[in-house]
Amino acid sequence: MAPVAAATGWRLLLVLSAAGLGAAGAPQPPNILLLLMDDMGWGDLGIYGEPSRETPNLDRMAAEGMLFPSFYSANPLCSPSRAALLTGRLPIRNGFYTTNRHARNAYTPQEIVGGIPDQEHVLPELLKEAGYVSKIVGKWHLGHRPQFHPLKHGFDEWFGSPNCHFGPYDNRARPNIPVYRDWEMVGRYYEEFPINLKTGEANLTQVYLQEALDFIKRQQAAQRPFFLYWAIDATHAPVYASRPFLGTSQRGRYGDAVREIDNSVGKILSLLQDLRISENTFVFFTSDNGAALISAPNQGGSNGPFLCGKQTTFEGGMREPAIAWWPGRIPAGRVSHQLGSIMDLFTTSLSLAGLAPPSDRVIDGLDLLPAMLGGQLTDRPIFYYRGDTLMAVTLGQYKAHFWTWTNSWEEFRQGIDFCPGQNVSGVTTHTQEEHTKLPLIFHLGRDPGERFPLSFASTEYLDVLQRVTPVVQQHQKTLVPGQPQLNVCDRAVMNWAPPGCEKLGKCLTPPESTPKKCSWPH
């Protein structure tokens, strides 16, 4: 069988199996539910060794499904990671990067002019071909100007915000972030959607949970396949939880937020079972990047044994918690050692729907179904970018660093530290250190904390270098970067007057447009 035909046959058999249908029946593709947390660390779940064991629902999800201990973000920051998930492509390809060398690669503050390019195929757009109804609940973060609205990029419904819940702002120098229902805003954070920074109380996770439950019920009643992208703000700083969860964790306010997330995931999975659609619903839980150690201990989580955190390309910034759950399809209680990427959720979702990925562009995401359903492992590299620079690559158990850098000495002296308590001489550098000729190579199985680079003179080092070098050369030779979306800033494009503001009396007057190159910190 030719490769294309084989792939088509695989998808067809999968869909028929998932629906419990033979060739005579009309296939019903499985529902797809992607649960994307914000800044949650690999070490925040009991199943990954968090000692207080405060995530019983997520731990049970893993026991009933499959755990991926080697699952990676496509970038150590929010927006590029989300763009990669929804396009199946590295941020350097889809435009979610900046050409300011080694910059933190953009958290898309309100003044960012760019967003998801029209020419990118976004997952819900493609799922429409298979009859899916799609909803995003929570943070979009792929551009807040009208042309970047999620309903213009394939989603049928949206409840959430275009940016993170930073604030409160005075609505003069900077507006508070709007919350949308579909096309129009229904309020703003810290106004109609209060967040008490002193106590940490906010009801947002409960609001987002109810949106998810209502959507699932409606689609089940209508007998329509659905794609739900539940991308809530928790556990991003400023960390919040609703009143019933505040003060319940041994881990402080951050732990309270994790417990509320765990409870919410439990309710979502229980609803799928109560509606008797769990065996026809694929669920995947992960995070957009590593825990923000800079915000720890009360506002940041744990990256387990890994080095550093969010904003770095060490393992703590890029390796994520990941659980796949599909009762009756994915064998329960399994662990997959497949190197996985958040970009794989794009390709895997298309495969679940019986669709092939676009053939007119490079797709970096891998179809994980062979790993999940058949235990097949695929050898593949994981590329770590920061800005427009390839910082590192993992191949098998080995990781090669071509550049190392955490944050600047200036920031470090101000108390800003992305690797608190984890100084590794020659590795966690505060200047941009190049290793392209002799990369620092670590064996992540023996040394997950990236503390002991292989000796340059060792046979092991030379063997790994021979394996890694052609992979990197081929990647760089064939790479065609997308148009950078995160270079230009303009205060006039902030959320001054979103659609629907006039109905609420919430329109604000924007300042004069003064576009300029964004000043990305180093």
Swiss-Prot record:
Statement: the UniProt record of this protein carries the keyword Nucleus: no
Keywords linked to the UniProt accession: Calcium, Disulfide bond, Glycoprotein, Hydrolase, Lysosome, Metal-binding, Signal
UniProt GO cellular component terms: lysosome
PANTHER family: ARYLSULFATASE FAMILY MEMBER (PTHR42693), N-ACETYLGALACTOSAMINE-6-SULFATASE (PTHR42693:SF47)
Name listed for the protein in its UniProt record: N-acetylgalactosamine-6-sulfatase
Binding residue positions for Ca(2+): D38, D39, C78, D288, N289
Region (Catalytic domain): 27-379
Signal peptide range in chain numbering: 1-25
Swiss-Prot/TrEMBL cofactor(s): Ca(2+)
GO molecular function: arylsulfatase activity; metal ion binding; N-acetylgalactosamine-6-sulfatase activity
Note on how the cofactor is bound: Binds 1 Ca(2+) ion per subunit.
Swiss-Prot/TrEMBL catalytic activity: Hydrolysis of the 6-sulfate groups of the N-acetyl-D-galactosamine 6-sulfate units of chondroitin sulfate and of the D-galactose 6-sulfate units of keratan sulfate
